Amino acid sequence: HDAKLQQLREAETNNGYGESAGYDAVRNRAQKHRDELQQLVSELNDSGKKICGYGASTKGNVLLQYCGFTRNDIPVIAEVNQDKFGCFTPHTLIPIASEDEVLAMKPDYLLVLPWHFRDNILVREQNYLNNGGSFLFPLPAIDVVTGEHQRQAAWSHHVNRSGCATGSIWVS
């Protein structure tokens, strides 16, 4: 165990985590990513697009709170768990409704809060995509997946080494 602990300590030191600068860099990347997601959601809302949430997950609630999103930004979150219907997200107080109810609202974008289930969601929700809907995946990089041809639009022309996307929307 001592050898593994020593390896871990060396890796932390080599990556700058022995000093506050290493943590400052992580904080700065997280804040930049948050700012870019806030900007994208704001621009989409300002252009008249309807954005709803998809999946009332714990990870998603952390993201909603960190970004400061409210029901003004995301009016409702689609969920499959009936126990959550009629409830609200912690702190941000965004209402949670059934997926069927939210999809009937014909949102232009669904902000995916359990983004780690990306592949399963894209397979499961082909009908939504084929009918013109788009998924907005906030992490690990901001990514928009749109309909018919499963074109992917990214929030940037590239994702930098830290995993943060920068720039504007483009379609490939």
Label for each model-derived stretch:
Residues R34, Q82, R151-A153:
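Intrinsically disordered, low-complexity segments enriched in glycine/proline and serine/threonine
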Residues L40-L122, N131:
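A solvent-exposed beta-alpha-beta segment
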